[in-house]
Amino acid sequence: MAKKKVFVSGCYDLLHSGHIEFFRQAAEYGDLYVGIGSDATYLEYKHRKPMFPEEERLFMVKAVRYVKEAYINAGSGTLDFLPTLDIVHPDILVVNSDGGSEAK
């Protein structure tokens, strides 16, 4: 039986232990796929440039042992990950409550 595909999304700028723990917990449900907010979405959402450019954030997230694959999200705004969902076709979408807003 194939493992379920699990999807999470975020900016992951200044990747830290809280992100790693989130990945670990999400990966308990199956193979973990991660969407990363683009530089443009980061600027739109946080009103400043990220500390690390999208390609560097992608590299760091892919290096995390719990992550099967990672992508730079091609959409914009809070739901910037929708085009990535069309690529991954996850069985499970995991959303955390950390750093959230009413829109989240």
Predicted regions and their residues:
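Nucleotidyltransferase catalytic core that binds NTPs
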Residues: M1-K104
